[in-house]
């Protein structure tokens, strides 16, 4: 596959990942994870704890579904990509994906913004799949960079 083809396939994986978690309140179709993630993928949520220290929670796919399922069941949630950069080398890729999270697509301002740092592998049988994803949100002193 050409580099342009790889970039298009990577883009489709990222688009599916956002589509999978976004929507009105209700259960998510977690079987869609197979369209985006390697079965052994890790998702890492980061935050600043009450003491002002960086903290993280490392989750497998089932952990993520279990941890976020109750939130999605009760809340409208839309995560919209607002910037993307793909770095590609052979069978590995890195995507910087800036996002806005909203309870409604009509909200004037997002609830939060941040960046997903996503690493992918070109699986010979399934194509590009996310191996790891770590994210952080904007906060005082930390703003999204430009994605020109």
Spans of model-derived segments:
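Short beta-strand edge/turn micro-motifs at domain boundaries
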Residues: 94, 113-144
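Short, low-complexity N-terminal intrinsically disordered segments enriched in polar/charged residues
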Residues: 1-39, 148
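Short consensus segments that form the blades of beta-propeller domains
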Residues: 108-110
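Surface-exposed, charged secondary-structure patches
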Residues: 42-43, 55-106
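Early exported N-terminus immediately downstream of N-terminal targeting peptides
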Residues: 37-46, 50
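Non-catalytic cap/lid and distal C-terminal segments of serine-dependent acyl enzymes
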Residues: 64-66, 112, 145
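Short beta-strand segments enriched in hydrophobic/aromatic residues
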Residues: 21, 37, 99-101, 134-137
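A short local loop/turn or secondary-structure capping micro-motif enriched for an aromatic residue
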Residues: 51-53, 103-105, 137-142
